[in-house]
Amino acid sequence: MAKEQKSNNGANLGFEAKLFLAADKLRGSMDASEYKHVALGLVFLKYISDAFNTVFEKLQADEFADEEDAEEYLAERTFWVPKEARWGHLQANAKQPTIGKLVDDAMLAIEKSNASLKGVLPTNYAREALNKTMLGELIDLISTIGMNEESDKSKDILGRVYEYFLGGFAGAEGKRGGEYFTPRSIVRVLTEMLEPYKGRVYDPCCGSGGMFVQSEKFVVEHGGRIGDIRVYGQEMNNTTWRLAKMNMAVRGIDADIKWNNEGSFHKDELADLKADFILANPPFNISDWGGDRLREDVRWKYGTPPASNANYGWLQHIIHHLAPNGTAGVVLANGSMSSNSSGEGDIRQSLVEHDLVDCMVALPGNLFYGVTIPCCLWFLAKNKNTEGFRNRKGEVLFIDARKLGTMVNRVVREFSADDTAQISDTYHAWRGEEHAIERRGEYEDVSGFCYSASLDEVKTHGYVLIPGRFVGAEDEIDDGIPFDEKFASLRDVLSEQFAKGKELED
C-alpha cells in the first residue's frame, strides 16, 4: 500500500472529504446553513488569490510588464486582487483578533476592483458572534489546499474543494440543502444523457450552479472545448445566487446568471433565450408560485398549469425556452408522471401528443439529502429527427432505474459510474448513437428496466408516464406531497363538491 502523503496535494484518497471533515469540526455549534458561507467565502478568496499569483509570477518574469497593473490581469481574464486582499496577508494575520475585519476588508476591496463580483461576496466575518479563533484556524486549514503544487493545479484543486464543500454542507442541512444543491448522481445522469458538447446551456432555477459545473466537466472529459458552451441561468434566492456566482468563478466558467426576487415565472430575465440544452431541478410541487397571476401567459401553449402546483409550469417554461432542436432534462416529483389534478393530465396528454416527451426515467429514493422519496427525470425534445440521431418520432423511451444505486450511508444513495452509464447508454443506443451501440449493442427492450413505447401505447395507459407500467415493474409511486397538505387539499375538494351538491338540490 502506498504511503499517504502529508500535504493536501489532491492526490490523497478522499482528500476533499478529509478536508471537509476538518473544516466541519471547526464550526462547533454554528448552524451549517450559516457556516457554509464562512467556509465557502474563504475557499473562494484562496482561489482568486492563487489565480492572481499565477499571473503575478508570469508578469514578474517579464521585464516589460508591471505586475501591479490591474489591466494586465484583465487581459489574462483574471480577477485583480489588491494587496490587502491577498491570501498571504490574511494568512499572516490569521491569529490576530482583527482577522474578521481584515477578511471583510479583503472581500470589499475585491468587489470594488471587480465589477462582476459586486454584491456577491460575504462581508460579515467581523460580526461578534463569529468565533475569531475558529476563523483563524479555518484560514490555516484552507491555506494547506494546493500547498506544494503549481498554481494552475492549485486552482483546480480549490474548484473541486468548493464543489465538495457545497455538497457536504447540503448534506448537513438535510432537506434545506436540496434547495441549492442537486446531488451529483442526478446531475451526472442529466449531463451524460443530454451530452452538452456545444451550444447554449440554461437552468431557470440554477441553485448554486451544479448543472453548469457538471456540463463543463462533461465537455472536458469528452475532449471538447469549454468555449464551445455558453451558460445562462436564473435564481430567485439572493444568497444562493451568490454561491452560484462564486462557484462559476472558481471553476473558470463564464456564466450569465441573473437574479431577481420574483423568479423565472414572474420576471424572466432571459425571456428571449432559446437554449440548446436545459437542465433543471425545480422545487417540487410548489403551491405558492403565483400561478393565478399568469393565467393567460404565452408559455402555457399546452394548457394552463394549476395555481396549486408549479410542476407543469416549469415543464412549459422550459419547453418555451428550447431552441428548435433543443433538448431538456428536468427533475420532478413522481406525481408529475400520473397526476390528473386540476387539468395536469390534460397538459401531460398534450405534451405527449405534440411528441415532446423523449424519455422518462424513474429514480430510486434517498438520492436527495434529507428526502427519502423517489423522483423522476423528464427528457424533452423539440425535434426527434435531428441530424446524428435516428428518427424517434412517435416513440417514448421508459427507463426504470429504481433498483440502481448503492446506499453510501444510512440515508443517502448514490449512483456508481456503471449505474450512470447503464442509464445513459440505454438512452443513447435508443437514439441510435454509435458510441453507445459499440459499448452496449443495439437497443433492445429489457424486461423490468427499459421499454420503447409508441404514442398509441402511451394513450392506452391514459397518458400516465410511469416507467414501471411499461417495463413490467410494479408501481411504487409517491407523489412527494406531504400527507397533511394532501389531506387538506382533498378536504377542500370534498367541501366544494358538497357545496355543489347542495346547490343542485336547491
Can you say where each PLM-predicted feature lies in the sequence?
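Conserved nucleotide-binding/hydrolysis micro-motifs of P-loop NTPases
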Residues: L45, N238-T239, P283-I286, N334-M337, ...
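Short, contiguous acidic/charged loop-to-helix segments that flank catalytic cores in large enzymes
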Residues: S29, W289-N309, G335-E344, P364-G370, ...
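Conserved Class I SAM-dependent methyltransferase catalytic core
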Residues: K25, E34-Y47, W241, P306-L380
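Non-catalytic, mostly N-terminal accessory regions of nucleic-acid modification and defense proteins
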Residues: M1-Y197, D256-E269, A362-N366, N383, ...
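Active-site lining segments that contact anionic ligands and/or coordinate catalytic metals
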Residues: K274-A275, N309-N311, N325-T327, V331-A333, ...
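Short acidic (Asp/Glu) and glycine-rich catalytic loops that position anionic groups and cofactors
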Residues: D140-L141, D254-N260, R293-V298, T327-A333, ...
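Feature representing long, continuous alpha-helical segments
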Residues: V213, R242, A280-P282, Y312-Q316, ...
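Conserved S-adenosyl-L-methionine
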Residues: R176-A280, N285-W289, L294-E296, A333-G335, ...
